[in-house]
Structure formats: structure tokens, C-alpha cells
Amino acid sequence: SVGGKTAIDLPGGKNLVGAFKQPVAVLCDLDTLDTLPKMFLADGMGEVIKYGMIRDEKLFELLEQHNLENVSSAMDEIVPTCIDIKRDVVEQDEFDTGERMILNFGHTLGHAVESYYHYETYTHGSAVAAGMCMMTEKTCTPELYVRLCDCVKAYDLPTEVPASLSELVPLCGNDKKRASAALRFIVCETIGKAEIRSMPFDEFAVWMGGDA
């Protein structure tokens, strides 16, 4: 893929063992998107919304103008934009030691959601969508939270899950972005700009409303 990451999942969490191997080429045939069931298109849109949130307000605004039923008409613009964003981020930080971590917005809680439900109830994109919304509710203005949730719902994605934060947060301790006793996580206080934060895991648990 664009970025060159390969990884495997372990019982303790997703993508915990991996390597970097840049591809010779990446081919994108947009016509294949028309063959997908709606649920898989929605799954991919969770990651697309993420790109708008972390780097491109105009992309986010474009997504707000569409929904799951008509977004195919905008894929000629959406897909190249997402690729450009990822390529730009990866060129600055190929080995995921700093800036590249912003690509994991929504994934700290998203991976916890997937793990909690044993990778059976929520697809990756839907878990990331819920993770973005849950994190944004804790870190942003109510107006931005509502705006993100409205966009997420337009693509038939969840903004929350039945599991409580006290059930999900302990699973964040297995996240690959954790460094020793500290957890690094991504927030977007404004659309188009992501920030990497770090705090001791126990403090993160209290801050999010979970149990340490």
C-alpha cells in the first residue's frame, strides 16, 4: 500500500508485529469501487473522513456535501486527495516515529472497539469512525463534535458503541502507539489539523473516564 507498512495481528491487539517494505507500484482502479456492497464502501469512508479531519478541511467539506448514496460521483477527487495526504505524511516520517502517527486518528479507541467485540461486530472503518467521534467528544468543542458525527452518520457509520469507555480504555494499553508507561494518541481540535499527545496510561484512563 501507499506507505509500505505490513503487519500481523496478535491475540493482544492489531498490527503489533510489522515491517516496512515500500511497494514497486500502487494501482488504483476506481471502477472496482462500483462492485462493492454498500457496507464495504462505508467501511472505507471511515478512513476517508479521517484524512479530512487530520489534514484537509476542504476534503472534509466535500464529504459533508455527499453521503453514502452519492459519494461515488466524487471519488475522482477523493481518492487522489487521500493518497496525496498519506504520501506527504509518510515522506516526512517513513518509519512511524513522529508525524506519521497522525494517520492513527481514531485508531486508539477504534482498535479497542475491535478487540472488545472480538473483531466480529465492527469493521475496521466503522470502529475507527466511532473512535474518532469518542475522542473528539473529549477533546473538542461541541460544535466540532456534532459536525464530525453528522458526517460520520451520512456514511452509515457509528458515532459510538454500546461498550462503555471504562470497558474500552483498558484495551488501549495494547495499542502500538504506547511507549512504555505512556500512551500516545491523536486529537483534532480543528478540522484539518491533527496533534499528537502523550500522557501516562493511568492518567489517560482517568481523563477518558475509564478505570486505570
Please name every model-derived segment.
Residues 40, 46-48, 144-212:
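C-terminal charged capping/lid subdomain of soluble metabolic enzymes
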Residues 31, 106, 192:
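Anionic group-transfer/hydrolysis microenvironments
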